[in-house]
Amino acid sequence: MKPAVLALALCGLVSSTGISAAQEVKPLKVMLITGGCCHDYKKQTEILKKGLEERINVTVDQIHVDDGSTKPALPIYGNPDYGAGYDLIIHDECAADVKDEATVKGVLKPHVEDGIPAVALHCAMHSYRVGDINKPAKEGSADALWFEFIGIQSSRHGAQKPIEISFKNHVVTKGMKDWTTINEELYNNVKVFKTADELAKGKQEGEKDAVVVWTNTFGKNKVKVFGTTLGHNNATVEDPRYLDLVAKGALWATDKLDTAGKPKPGYGRVKK
């Protein structure tokens, strides 16, 4: 086994049949949404696309706008059927001031109504803030629209400092070891919804410990959502441990991760 494949195997991203079976399995079609305030999304969209396509059997289509505002002009707005034909949507946008309830419902429609699973990364948790973000939102209320879907409500972060990550036992985290990030943002937890399952906590000097990795199952379609608040800086996003985590979260959300934490046949790394 080649060294690169061996490294992925140690993280559970290559199964014994994954490479050969992947030749016969159609790649998962993934939409990656990036753009908005405060992050190097132009670079991060490329890091994520490359990292995911190297690790698992996916094709990543990028929906990116080079708009650094808190109201990025993403083409998904006003187009509630934007997810048609996709197996997974990754929300990595930062849109804190997109607050119109109808717009937020349109963003949620492919998930809540059509049942398309999701991955939510970093500032996605600080997007689509309808109502008072500092008060725990009541389930079913307009204030909870986005937060209830992703599973966690967050309102702020502190200064950038290293975060000590401690994982819990879960199929997504099998084979992963605790690690400490470079300087990063620890997002607070205003509320962790009952449907969310905590996978890792983060500890940072001067801040209260917070859930930083989780899964959520939401709504009438029991749509699966994998989330992490980690990933502000490019160096974190391109860290192989981070990319492994997001890749396994994507497989979990699409029901392509087995009980041993490995890709189901055909969904592991595709041999190039």
Residue ranges, per PLM feature:
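Helical hinge/lid and interdomain linker segments adjacent to catalytic or ligand-binding clefts
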Residues: 23, 29-33, 40-127
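Extracellular ligand-binding/catalytic regions of CAZymes and related secreted enzymes
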Residues: 23-28, 43, 54, 84, ...
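Active-site rim elements
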Residues: 35-38, 157-162, 231-240
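A glycine-rich, often tryptophan-bearing local segment used as a flexible ligand/cofactor-contacting loop or short
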Residues: 96-175
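Proline-centered loop/turn at the N-terminus of a beta-strand
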Residues: 117-119, 197, 224
